Amino acid sequence: MKANYKITKLLGEGSFGKAYLATVDNEDKKYVIKQVIMDGMTDQEKRETFNEAAILKRLDHPNIIKFKEVFRQSQPKEALNIVTEYADGGDLEQKIEAQKKKPFPETQILDYFTQICLALQHLHKKHIIHRDLKGGNVFLMQSGLVKLGDFGIAKGLKTSKEKAKTTVGTPYYLSPEIINNKPYDTKSDIWSLGILLYQMMTFKMPFNAQSLPLLSIKINRGVYSPPPSVYSAELRDILKRCLSQDPEKRPSIKLLMIFYNCLLLRIELITS
């Protein structure tokens, strides 16, 4: 670990490493150091680790966790340390859990939703698929900013026509094309965005099962309980479009932003 970083807290740990909260000498800011232990990794796992750092370096957007630096260490074990800004408001998964079944106001959902869309818009313009969009990877700042993070399995494509093939992601958020081992593109992120939107509207998953085979069946059927009618028909329509079985029928991020602006205008007209 670099001498100028002072570790203040262990934030979490996984199979390949740990995440620490740290401060830097003569700075007011807090940082997260994701330390990935590379001893025992396969070549593919090492490539994925370097890939996360490489993608973070390419990204500069207010709604994406800001990259500070990356450095390697050889003692006591070979490790790669990825340093990013710290989100002081927790994550969206924690926020949904803390809401304790009290419905989010539609304006709050739209605020979160549009900021996630802006982050995805930046990614998709660079032909990057996040591939693990979920509440635990959407970080909140006390200022109200929403920041997309954790690019451990993100995939950079060479062109907008190229598709990814690897089956990766969190099961409940997997799109039908990934479940069925078909090539996929940025529209797979739109599906995951729809799952997250449904969570914010209902506090549950649209497709739930105790095993991956059963979950796959439910995702392929595409049948889910409708969200509460307290939310506008326009918001429910956005959800329906995001969860289209056919990726070609899902809106692009650009089109989603148009839907959002129309919905925002409607709310302003009603409340004025």
Predicted segments with their positions:
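Conserved N-lobe ATP-binding subsite of Hanks-type protein kinase domains
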Residues: K18
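Regulatory alphaC helix of protein kinase catalytic domains
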Residues: T49, A53-A54
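Short beta-strand micro-motifs within the conserved protein kinase catalytic domain, predominantly
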Residues: K66-K77
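Activation segment signature within eukaryotic-like protein kinase domains
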Residues: Y112-F113
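Conserved catalytic-loop aspartate of Hanks-type protein kinases
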Residues: D189
